[in-house]
Curated annotation (Swiss-Prot):
It comes from the Bacteria. This is Urease accessory protein UreF. Required for maturation of urease via the functional incorporation of the urease nickel metallocenter. It is found in: Cytoplasm.
Length: 229
């Protein structure tokens, strides 16, 4: 694929847009459990959860995998990373969310940015040899377009944070201005996560705070739910 600064920017704006039809609007990644308990009750308390989510789950999973895709020298390694990021997601709803959003994003990305590695990944996912995951899809596109590794990590983490903030605005709820304030705060948390992820040993992938995963597992048995995870 031809890559210029403009094509890289526009590709990120498209694929990292919270409006991309991947189904991200239907996932809370566990914050709905904290909302049900009353731990999250306003924009400030949601911000505490979001900062933890970025520092823990996104930093030790998605960010590490994106970096590893950039450094991979074979498609076999990409396949291993797909299996690993899927297997390390202990809560079933989180595994399912990764698969469904990954498949939808892969379909869009493969049509718009048909890089050989992305075409291979689409074929493997279609054949159910691999599961599909948004972090790997974006890493393959970003690498093909010569997006800098740190920028690719930041864009994915920021996009995920944006989707969660939009979901929280309607679920908690709180106002749009409070949401914009959180988006600004999230930029600082994402910047820190990008730096921290560069120093994480690959063997530490998936080292997530147990409380976060427990809340994600408990969500499945919640009596009333707005979100699928």
């Amino acid at each position: 694929m031809e890559s210029t600064r403009m094509t890289r920017t526009l590709a990120a704006m498209q694929l990292m847009d919270s409006a991309l039809p991947t189904g991200a609007f239907s996932h809370s990644h566990g914050f709905e459990t904290y909302l049900h308990r009353g731990v999250i009750h306003d924009a400030s308390s949601f911000g505490v959860w979001l900062q933890m989510f970025i520092q823990q789950q996104l930093t030790f999973t998605d960010a590490v995998v994106i970096r590893e895709v950039f450094r991979s020298t074979s498609l076999k390694r990409v396949g291993e990373l797909d299996q690993l990021i899927t297997a390390q997601a202990v809560p079933e709803q989180i595994r399912t969310a990764g698969k469904t959003m990954g498949i939808r994003m892969l379909e869009i990305a493969e049509q718009g940015y048909p890089d050989p590695a992305l075409i291979w990944y689409r074929r493997e996912v279609d054949q159910r040899t691999l599961s599909g995951h948004p972090a790997i899809v974006w890493a393959l596109v970003a690498r093909a377009l010569d997006v800098a590794e740190d920028e690719a990590v930041a864009q994915h983490l920021y996009a995920t944070s944006m989707s969660l903030i939009h979901n929280a605005v309607r679920a908690v709820p709180f106002g749009q201005n409070a949401g914009q304030h959180l988006i600004r705060q999230a930029q600082e948390w994402v910047t820190a996560a990008v730096g921290n992820s560069a120093d994480i040993e690959f063997d530490d992938i998936g080292s997530i705070t147990p409380g976060l995963e427990i809340a994600q597992m408990q969500h499945e048995n919640q009596r009333a739910r707005m979100f699928m995870s």
